[in-house]
Amino acid sequence: MKGMSHEPKSPSLGMLSTATRTTATVNPLTPSPLNGALVPSGSPATSSALSAQAAPSSSFAAALRKLAKQAEEPRGSSLSSESSPVSSPATNHSSPASTPKRVPMGPIIVPPGGHSVPSTPPVVTIAPTKTVNGVWRSESRQDAGSRSSSGGRERLIVEPPLPQEKAGGPAIPSHLLSTPYPFGLSPSSVVQDSRFPPLNLQRPVHHVVPPSTVTEDYLRSFRPYHTTDDLRMSSLPPLGLDPATAAAYYHPSYLAPHPFPHPAFRMDDSYCLSALRSPFYPIPTPGSLPPLHPSAMHLHLSGVRYPPELSHSSLAALHSERMSGLSAERLQMDEELRREREREREREREREADREREKEREREREKEREQEKEREREKERERELERQREQRAREKELLAAKALEPSFLPVAELHGLRGHATEERGKPSEQLTPTRAEKLKDAGLQAPKPVQHPLHPVPTPHHTVPSLISNHGIFSLPSSSAATALLIQRTNEEEKWLARQRRLRQEKEDRQSQVSEFRQQVLEQHLDMGRPPVPAEAEHRPESTTRPGPNRHEPGGRDPPQHFGGPPPLISPKPQLHAAPTALWNPVSLMDNTLETRRAESHSLHSHPAAFEPSRQAAVPLVKVERVFCPEKAEEGPRKREPAPLDKYQPPPPPPREGGSLEHQPFLPGPGPFLAELEKSTQTILGQQRASLPQAATFGELSGPLKPGSPYRPPVPRAPDPAYIYDEFLQQRRRLVSKLDLEERRRREAQEKGYYYDLDDSYDESDEEEVRAHLRCVAEQPPLKLDTSSEKLEFLQLFGLTTQQQKEELVAQKRRKRRRMLRERSPSPPTIQSKRQTPSPRLALSTRYSPDEMNNSPNFEEKKKFLTIFNLTHISAEKRKDKERLVEMLRAMKQKALSAAVADSLTNSPRDSPAVSLSEPATQQASLDVEKPVGVAASLSDIPKAAEPGKLEQVRPQELSRVQELAPASGEKARLSEAPGGKKSLSMLHYIRGAAPKDIPVPLSHSTNGKSKPWEPFVAEEFAHQFHESVLQSTQKALQKHKGSVAVLSAEQNHKVDTSVHYNIPELQSSSRAPPPQHNGQQEPPTARKGPPTQELDRDSEEEEEEDDEDGEDEEEVPKRKWQGIEAVFEAYQEHIEEQNLERQVLQTQCRRLEARHYSLSLTAEQLSHSVAELRSQKQKMVSERERLQAELDHLRKCLALPAMHWPRGYLKGYPR
């Protein structure tokens, strides 16, 4: 009822005691049923200040007089002034607070229940005084702060305490409640909230106040009427308005708290108080609100007699007995009238609302209708588009088919197919119409067949459709379910598509029926397709299931002629004897094999369709699917395929659809294209046969083959489609890839790339996000170790970068080198070698080519030229032989010395021969003994093979054995240890040439070195010659080693080296170990090899000897000298380069860092300069703004100053100048 606080407006009738500010508590009149009816129930509870005031003047009359006076005043002054403050229900409610200390008044609210009489008599508090009101108001506010905020005086306004209102009980509008008690009983006092029984309003009987209730307070309190019952009209119990009266007094809304305590239903609150005044009372204050219609004043309690004093201007007058009767009647009538009007208005309102609702509904319906129409239009448009698209697709398909046909089918077949397709097409319409019926029949037939389909785990053709995915429907049985899901998704689309296809088919049919017939004949002839094109199509589906092969058989599947035009074969295609999925003739596989093969196969298949039929059928269904090739199909192929499966599922439609869709699909493209497509698809499908079709198709088809009639087959044909579909947009066939395959591929990729990919059938773009998130996640994890990822290393190498580990290794190497260099004047070759990891020459010795092969290689000359770049020369067989002879001589001479020198050479060899030293010297010695045998054996075995006649052989065996003892022991060991490492290959090339010689030479030289004496006797000339050669060779070797990597040398070297190689112990050893394939033909029969080997030996020995010579000489002069020939120089240079590179890298990285820094700084600088510029411009703006404002100010000042002087004139003329 907050709304009702009329503080401002309602003059409280009770203003009477304005001056006193005391509240007279009228014993609550027992409320008549009307809650509000106030009957003096004599509950002292409400005694209020007034009562206190009254008490002193025990004389009733005095009290009345006073009241009257006050009433007069208040009406004018107080009403206007106070009433406003007072009428707040809040006050009333806060009756506990407001009713001074008497009874907790508890807001008295009319029980929401209705106007049932509150159990407790309402207490009427008269709070006429402003002060009191003020106080009360505040109190009440605190008290009832929750209730209405208007803390008015307790007024007549009966404002049920807000709580009640809040509670939702209809609050009785204050005007209703507020009885216009002259005493300013506040309605709250009147209305008692049943909820606040605490009010001690004792009133067991509503209407009657038991005498006992009359308390002292009551007596003392201002009572305009005697307590005695006689004062009350008997008819109206004390004030109890019987319901009728109450009704009269109170507006119905008051009586029954209106369900909507909505202001609309209450009398205007603002006028409440005035309303309470009955028209009979004069309303003195002109400004006061106009009295409301009498009905509004339910003031006069008819039964109450107000003392005449009160009646004067005070509202009390109303209550005077004189008026009470009249007013009661009048009020009653008014009330009734008003109630009538209210009811009328209510009804009106309801009707209004109904009408509104009707209109709303109407509008809704309108909207819906609009939407419907819109939708219809949309559909129309779509259909139009579809038709156009189909048209286009068909044209494209035809073109494509024409282009493709040749490639796929033999011309005859193509024509046949084309005719067939056309016919099919035409027939499709016919058939679809007729055939459709047939197909439907087929479908019906196939429907039963589907039972067979059970094979497919899910009978749903989807499975077949899955076949869609791959052609091997046959194989795919299991997977079909997955496929099925996919297919199912697409099925709806496909169905739509099929319907469209059917329509198109019919149109085309008309156009092409003649052609199609002719074509069909041709087709049948060509394809041996007994299947009628259209029915075939229809059948395809059904038959597909039944006999996938015939269905599509591609053109090849002629088995069932039924397919193409005719109704589904009555007899299921040959029992799928060939049901074996593998057996299925997979056009795709055929295609894959090659068109030719396929064609042949098709033909052969056709030839023995019986055998292949079942399988073929299975495959064919795939093919059928292929029909999807039509451009439209291609486009919609997937959709179609699904629909096809759907069709299959929906047996009747499917067949037509099958036929139609398959047929028509190809049909769209054009029969030829369709066939071509078929073939293509067959190929693709077969190619794809993979799981999808296999799964679906397999099911469908297997089941088909197994169950000849199974209608699911048609879907299978769809499957083939997956392989290739004609892409309308690309205008070319494109491979149709099943989602499963895609999924699979993605998963595989993901595995390879190292991220996790979950196979999710429903994979779609939205999953991309997840995958991306996952990738992010993975990216945040520690990366693969660089060193273990060759890809990464390769990538880094592009930028000249390497991994930290490698860098550290390099640095460590450098450090080691430096230390070594500092420690020993000359770097120790072995370390260098190992560091360089230059395989010991021996390792490199083995080669696959024989010298002859190498000499005969096509680019032999080029290779020779290449060698010359490194100052190397190719040695012809003759030269080699000469050299070898020389070596033999030298060896023979050396042998004696060698045996003696062996020990020395062993000691020396480690330091002398890099190769030997490579393997640890100690080991070498040990190994000499241990390995000698092996080496020797090897050398012996090799030697015989390679040995030259007599002399060579003799010399060699001894020498070899010796050499092997030395070299093999050291070299072999080194080699053995190294070779496994795989250095062999490396060294092979570099060393092939130089190394091989070196190998042997080294040992020889060592031995020689050890016993240089044996050489002394040697002829000086020869020695010089050999020395030169050895120097030459060592240089070459060094070069080779450095450029060893260069395979080029290998070619020629290989030849040369091969020969020499096989002489090399390393080779021998390797041969003994695991004879390398052809160590330069070492393994070849000695005879074959004899020439070159001998040469090799000669050359090697020669080299060796030369080197020995050289070494010997060197060693004689400086036995300990470790000069490694150019190699060392190269090594040093290499290191130098590397260091430089490292340095460069470091500098580059620093440079890069600096550049980046510089860049970022320059950016910042730029930004700063921008901001500075901005600030400057702003400053400029501010300055100009300030100037402008200043100017304006000055102007204003002028204006303001001048006008004062010439004001009048200024006024008239505008601003004075």
Curated annotation (Swiss-Prot):
Ranges of Low complexity composition bias in the record: 43-63, 76-89, 103-114, 450-465
Membrane-spanning parts: none
Sequence positions bearing N6-acetyllysine: 496, 739
Biased composition (Polar residues): 15-33, 831-840, 847-858, 1068-1085
Keyword Phosphoprotein: yes
Biased composition (Basic residues): 813-822
Subunit-structure text: May be a component of a BHC histone deacetylase complex that contains HDAC1, HDAC2, HMG20B/BRAF35, KDM1A, RCOR1/CoREST, PHF21A/BHC80, ZMYM2, ZNF217, ZMYM3, GSE1 and GTF2I.
Biased composition (Basic and acidic residues): 331-385, 551-561, 633-645
Compositionally skewed regions (Acidic residues) per UniProt: 1099-1117
Residues recorded as bearing Phosphothreonine in the entry: 433, 907
Modification Asymmetric dimethylarginine, positions: 305
Compositionally biased residues, Pro residues: 711-720
Gene transcribed to yield this protein: GSE1
Any one GO BP annotation for this protein: placenta development
Spans annotated as Disordered: 1-155, 324-385, 418-465, 526-579, 633-675, 699-720, 807-858, 903-930, 948-981, 1068-1122
InterPro entries listed in its UniProt record: GSE-like, GSE1
Keywords, comma-separated and alphabetical: Acetylation, Coiled coil, Methylation, Phosphoprotein
Lineage, broadest ranks: Eukaryota, Metazoa, Chordata, Craniata, Vertebrata
Induction: Negatively regulated by miR-489-5p.
Superkingdom of source: Eukaryota
Protein name (record): Genetic suppressor element 1
Xref: Pfam families: DUF3736
Coiled-coil annotated spans: 321-403, 1127-1201
Modified residues (Phosphoserine): 10, 84, 95, 766, 826, 828, 857, 909, 1101
